[in-house]
Amino acid sequence: MVRQIKILPKHSIGHNFSGFDKSYPEELYSSLPIIEYTQIIDYINLKTQRDYKSYILYMIIFAIFGLLPFLIALIFELFRSSLYKNRFERDFDNCLKQINELIKCRNVTFSFKFTSKIRKMQKLELIISYQDEQPKKEIVGDFIVSPEGRNILVLPPAPLDLINFDQLYLSSSQSNKFNKSKKSNKINDKTPILNNNNNNNNNNNIINYCKTKINYNNSERKTNGLKDDNFYGFKDTNYDKDLYNFMLESEYQSMIREFNTVLVRKIDIKKQLIFLLVSTILLIALIGFILIIPAAILYSKKRSHYYTHLYNDLNIMVHKYSSIYNSRGITISYCFENSDDFNNDSSPLINILIIYPKAPKGSPILTNFTNNTHQWILVPTSPNAIAPYFTILNNMAYNNNNSIIENNFNNNYNNSNNNNNSNNSNSNNNNNNNNNNNNYNNNNYNNNNNQVQVYQTEQTLNYNI
């Protein structure tokens, strides 16, 4: 008997497609390993995520000046929309064919369909079909408590007979179709995402790096119901579980809260708005024609001053946290919600981007079940490896620093004995000894800093099983 699981895509606006969430359906526990499922969703998102820029505003402008330009623009828009969706379906279908060919030994197949006659991205479903005859595996694991007090179910390590998905990514990097879709995924960033000297290596960067977007907090703006120029900060609740190997949830929330503490503010333009309102009323009475000009200038200057300080502080915070997490391969950046806001350089619709490497082989996978409880699960890909990957790098760096300091200490000790035995040492030898002593002190200072940092990291990761 064949059963099906339907997975809805992430929320998106208009024709944009944001991909699928990597929450694991527990019905597949007997059929498809978690690590393979997450790699499949990664590949599907890589091939299908894209943005669609609508020309509806130009259509409205054309409608003001005449019906004929409006009809021409409408036909052109419908043609572009249909072409966009046809290409999307073609890429999605080719993507799923490659995946199904690769995992046919699992007796699991992936397909998709639109649930409405009008092809809307919000009505798209990813369908997973699997055989129900095979014996069910019971989900067995131990619970751990994260530093944030969250219960995480640790499952047994991933099986050894895993399917290698690297060939899918390699074929994607050499595909011309991917280059076309990458252009449509262009994000307008104020700061560069990656410092690349070779622009021809963009495909490898997309494959080797991931990014997660932290959306602006729009709840206050929605409650007001009016256009609001104030910036209300970022949401700190949507922790991306793919960040587990590079940044803890507590570090993530602490970073976003500091961003909000520094950046959240309100424009003090009450007097300017009152002045503008009074001038508008007088303008209607043909008296305030002269006053409307200074009112508009004051309003524009106040608004420009607000956004200048906002973006300056935002650049400072981005540089600060990029420096903090640079050793883990993480880059912090930001982007605007759409190109118009980017060009105007005065928009509160700002999203933070966290760019991080793909988790290396052997690192654990953090996701959750797609049931009513949304239980977080942690799957080690090697025995007893549940700690985030960056802690291993910190420990390696700590051990390397210890060996370097020990060698410097022995060298300095030998140099001091040689200096005591030689009475005719020249000034060059004295300078060398001073440099060695300075290097020894600097290494000791760096070692103390690294020791404190590693100790704090290990204390943060002290899970209670």
Curated annotation (Swiss-Prot):
Keywords in alphabetical order: Membrane, Transmembrane, Transmembrane helix
Domain of life: Eukaryota
Bilayer topology: Multi-pass membrane protein
Region (Disordered): 177-198, 411-449
Ranges that cross the membrane: 56-76, 273-293
Name under which the protein is recorded: Uncharacterized transmembrane protein DDB_G0294619
Principal location class: membrane
A Gene Ontology term for the protein's cellular component: membrane
Species per Swiss-Prot/TrEMBL record: Dictyostelium discoideum (Social amoeba)
Subcellular location: Membrane
